[in-house]
């Protein structure tokens, strides 16, 4: 993944081409009169649950009442926290909701605890260290009364009630291992996270920490340099961007980023570049490799297989679902990593196998070179699973590489997107709905609805059975963040980058049904 265009907030740059407990000082609050005042419901993990399904269990929002979804409260970022990081906005994390409190991190690494019912700021942990990997995504985890988060170079734990710092570890990353920019997962006494954009041996690394002390338990390199049968040229990158999957079988699975290489390099010195563009399954206690499934070997398009893996059961078979910017959904056997099916989503221009051809010395390219899905498209945000259906928000955004020595093209073409439903067992597309905008808010299920948000600043919902659009709500700013649904409330971070040279005021907005 390109170091300047990484994670969810990379979108802003592409669109521009085409178009420490302190007193609460980081934001202001407005509350809608007559809105539902509820503190019920939860969204306890980055993707709703440890299986990463993004299915809002216990949600009160459905097809029958979504038309009544109204603004409940708005929290406005102020001061330094409201300043754009790297020109791509202020918010890229997904909210966490536990015990009536919504937790959120901004791209300056500051953490907020807000009342779910009123939006009142309970406490703020001030870091003021801008996220550097993309910037973004980032975010926190909240487990057993402790908030876990990271700044670019350190990991910290806070008391969830007071925001008081419990521990911090500043010695986890070595030179060349990149920086932190991921929403961690916490389970079984361990904190799982990763670095991004490693530039030296090992590339980005996967880590597990002791949740009580912050001490390193294990570390796994996502780039190998001497494995039998692997010709890895050590160009760096790799690592993971999205929250990993912690499974009941004692494993943890990460979606890994791309190798940092040009088309010219991939053609002249082809390499599988393990474990880039793969889902990597490790023993959760030891970090030992169990299996991997590589979507694109020898990738030179900055594709990534970065989406949070999802745990599922397909006709009695434990499976893992993965996906990424190459525009494919993959289903793998959870025990072996064997690929069961893969399905293309979104638009493709016939060059899906270029990396495979280069690996076999059969690819010839000339610039300019049009890439679709582009490096800012495909499956950029996380998928959802409910019942026997997988829901995917897909971005169609081509990139033009004007030189084969570029790592990333600089000219974006016409942009569009869709939300699709796939059968869990077969991968067959059940419905495909086009949208007027870029769906980068992750797919999220609420009863018989599927929600996402559009980059341009719209919350949107679909009929889960048919794909028909049934709800739209204009947001106060552009958005790069996933939403969270807790009970009767939808929380939407709206703090994305500029559009047409203009930028709104970054806010965290809650909508609720009566």
Briefly describe each language-model feature range:
Residues 274, 280-284, 290, 302-361:
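Acidic, glycine-rich loop-and-beta core segments that form the ion-binding/anion-interacting portion
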Residues 2-18:
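Bacterial N-terminal signal peptides that target proteins for export
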Residues 40-50, 87-110, 132-155, 177-206, ...:
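Repeat-blade elements of multi-bladed beta-propeller folds
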């Amino acid at each position: 993944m390109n170091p300047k265009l990484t994670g969810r907030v990379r979108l802003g740059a592409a669109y521009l081409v085409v178009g420490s407990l302190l007193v609460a000082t980081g934001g202001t609050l407005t509350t809608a009169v007559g809105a539902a005042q509820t503190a019920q419901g939860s969204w306890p993990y980055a993707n709703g649950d440890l299986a990463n399904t993004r299915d809002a269990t216990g949600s009160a929002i459905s097809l029958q009442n979504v038309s009544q979804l109204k603004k409940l409260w708005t929290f406005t970022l102020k001061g330094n926290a409201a300043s754009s990081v790297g020109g791509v906005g202020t918010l890229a994390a997904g909210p966490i909701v536990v015990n009536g409190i919504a937790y959120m991190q901004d791209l300056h690494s500051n953490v907020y605890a807000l009342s779910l019912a009123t939006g009142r700021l309970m406490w703020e942990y001030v870091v003021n260290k801008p996220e550097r990997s993309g910037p973004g995504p980032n975010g926190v985890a909240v487990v057993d009364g402790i908030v876990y988060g990271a700044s670019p170079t350190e990991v910290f734990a806070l008391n969830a009630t007071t925001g008081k710092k419990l521990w911090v570890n500043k010695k986890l990353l070595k030179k060349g291992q990149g920086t932190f920019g991921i929403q961690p997962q916490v389970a079984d006494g361990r904190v799982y996270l990763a670095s991004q954009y490693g530039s030296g041996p090992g590339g980005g690394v996967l880590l597990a920490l002791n949740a009580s002390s912050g001490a390193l338990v294990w570390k796994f390199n996502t780039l190998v340099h001497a494995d039998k049968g692997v010709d890895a040229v050590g160009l760096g990158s790799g690592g993971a961007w999205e929250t990993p999957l912690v499974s009941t079988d004692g494993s943890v699975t990460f979606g890994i980023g791309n190798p940092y290489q040009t088309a010219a390099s991939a053609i002249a010195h082809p390499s599988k570049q393990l474990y880039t563009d793969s889902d990597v399954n490790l023993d959760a206690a030891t970090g030992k490799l169990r299996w991997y499934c590589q979507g694109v070997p020898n990738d030179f398009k900055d594709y990534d297989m970065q989406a949070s893996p999802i745990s599922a059961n397909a006709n009695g078979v434990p499976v893992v679902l993965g996906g990424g910017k190459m525009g494919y959904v993959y289903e793998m056997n959870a025990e072996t990593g064997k690929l069961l099916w893969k399905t293309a989503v979104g638009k493709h221009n016939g060059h899906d196998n270029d990396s495979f051809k280069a690996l076999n010395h059969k690819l010839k390219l000339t610039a300019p070179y049009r890439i679709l899905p582009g490096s800012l498209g495909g499956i950029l945000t996380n998928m959802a699973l409910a019942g026997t259906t997988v829901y995917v928000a897909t971005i169609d955004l081509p990139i033009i590489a004007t030189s084969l020595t570029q790592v990333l093209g600089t000219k974006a073409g016409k942009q569009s997107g869709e939300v699709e439903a796939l059968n869990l067992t077969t991968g067959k597309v059940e419905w495909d709905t086009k949208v007027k905008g870029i769906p980068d808010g992750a797919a999220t299920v609420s009863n018989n609805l599927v929600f996402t948000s559009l980059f341009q600043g719209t919350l949107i919902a679909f009929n889960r059975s048919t794909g028909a659009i049934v709800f739209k709500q204009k947001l106060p700013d552009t958005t790069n963040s996933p939403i969270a649904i807790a009970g009767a409330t939808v929380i939407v971070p709206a703090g994305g980058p500029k559009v047409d040279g203009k930028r709104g005021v970054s806010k965290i907005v809650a909508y609720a049904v009566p």
